[in-house]
């Protein structure tokens, strides 16, 4: 017997590496040392930082991956993977430096894997983050035919003096919400159930003219470049930041708010995007469940000094980023630290 007889095709793996090399190299930064194929990837951190603090993050894309596989949409799920990781490390003020991915499947389909990794490389390129390595694991009998799993890992850096940890947050600080591109990569176990039970046709169109499937599969917004620009120009105005992921608005912003303080969020400050309105209507989802499951149109939040909030908003306007003042930091009353109304 051979390894191929057992279900592992080394030649297919080598073909994949050759296919993705030019895509991966487009994401490289000057600090990357060497190319693909080494036992370890190298990144030169010297020269750019005085007191660097490394910030790491790892994530997947949840069961959005299941929907992507059902629809045969493999080219953007990699952008989701990058977004889930780099947006997280950005919260602490870190610039994502490099990224690694893990792709696992029962039988390697080179075309599918190349499409996925192409999306990862594109997400890294858009975030200024180098895709310096990864693992492609072909594991017979571990996954049903046509299915695969994904995970990502990123490392960023921030000057120690510029690290955002929420310590500067004060009562009266303003919450500025930046628009999401859709559900991003959270809440998809509920989304898939609603989609299946609604029986909506593949061509169903939402109130804004977008196809439902396109809205559900829209890749996660990448906030790295615009937010890093804000930190450079208005860093003193930003006291904390939050990436709105699993747990929604209810559970994510509060993670960067010190004890003794709470949040008041004005749900009338922005309009619920059509894809979320459809999900709530078709799934009979209560308001409270919407807030703690989905981002509801707000993908990233800046906690800002009130006197400088207007300047931040002008800077967001200059970058053509949709945004709203969605609330403020208040004194907490009892166990209820987040009020949405």
From Swiss-Prot:
Name one matching Pfam family.
Answer: AIRS
- GO BP term (any one): adenine biosynthetic process
Q: Which domain of life is it from?
A: Bacteria
Pathway in which this enzyme or protein is active: Purine metabolism; IMP biosynthesis via de novo pathway; 5-amino-1-(5-phospho-D-ribosyl)imidazole from N(2)-formyl-N(1)-(5-phospho-D-ribosyl)glycinamide: step 2/2
User: Which reaction is this enzyme known to catalyze?
Assistant: 2-formamido-N(1)-(5-O-phospho-beta-D-ribosyl)acetamidine + ATP = 5-amino-1-(5-phospho-beta-D-ribosyl)imidazole + ADP + phosphate + H(+)
Keywords of the record, alphabetical order, are: ATP-binding, Cytoplasm, Ligase, Nucleotide-binding, Purine biosynthesis
Gene Ontology terms for molecular function = ATP binding; phosphoribosylamine-glycine ligase activity; phosphoribosylformylglycinamidine cyclo-ligase activity
**Top EC class for this record:** ligase
| Family of this protein | Belongs to the AIR synthase family.
| Entries under PANTHER family matching the protein | TRIFUNCTIONAL PURINE BIOSYNTHETIC PROTEIN ADENOSINE-3 (PTHR10520:SF12), TRIFUNCTIONAL PURINE BIOSYNTHETIC PROTEIN ADENOSINE-3-RELATED (PTHR10520)
What is the name attached to this protein's record? Phosphoribosylformylglycinamidine cyclo-ligase
Question: What is the originating organism of this protein?
Answer: Xanthomonas axonopodis pv. citri (strain 306)
């Amino acid at each position: 017997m051979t390894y191929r007889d057992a279900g592992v095709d080394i030649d297919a793996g080598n073909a994949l590496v050759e296919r993705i090399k030019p895509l991966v190299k487009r994401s490289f930064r000057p600090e990357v040392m060497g190319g693909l194929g080494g036992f370890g990837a190298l990144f030169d951190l010297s020269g750019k930082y005085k007191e660097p603090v490394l910030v790491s993050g790892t994530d997947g894309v949840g069961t959005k991956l299941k929907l992507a596989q059902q629809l045969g949409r493999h080219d953007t799920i990699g952008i989701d993977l990058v977004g889930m990781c780099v947006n997280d490390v950005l919260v602490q003020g870190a610039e994502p430096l490099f990224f690694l991915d893990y792709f696992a499947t029962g039988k390697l389909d080179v075309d599918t894997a190349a499409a996925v990794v192409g999306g990862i490389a594109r997400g890294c390129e858009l975030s200024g983050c180098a895709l310096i390595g990864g693992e492609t694991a072909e594991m017979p009998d571990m996954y049903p035919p046509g299915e695969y799993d994904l995970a990502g890992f990123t490392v960023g850096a921030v000057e120690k003096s510029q690290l955002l940890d929420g310590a500067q947050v004060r009562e009266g600080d303003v919450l500025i919400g930046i628009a999401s591109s859709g559900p991003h990569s959270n809440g998809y176990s509920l989304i898939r159930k609603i989609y299946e039970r609604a029986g909506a046709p593949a061509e169903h169109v939402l109130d804004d003219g977008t196809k439902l499937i396109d809205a559900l599969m829209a890749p996660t917004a990448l906030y790295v470049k615009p937010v890093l620009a804000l930190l450079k120009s208005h860093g003193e105005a930003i006291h904390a930041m939050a990436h709105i992921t699993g747990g929604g608005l209810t559970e994510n912003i509060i993670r960067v708010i010190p004890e003794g303080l709470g949040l008041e969020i004005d749900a009338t400050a922005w309009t619920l995007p059509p894809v979320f309105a459809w999900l709530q209507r078709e799934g009979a989802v209560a308001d409270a469940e919407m807030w703690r499951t989905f981002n509801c149109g707000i993908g990233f939040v800046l906690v800002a000094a009130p006197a400088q909030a207007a300047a931040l908003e002008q800077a967001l306007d200059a970058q053509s980023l949709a945004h709203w003042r969605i609330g403020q930091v208040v004194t907490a009353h009892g166990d209820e630290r987040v009020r949405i109304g």
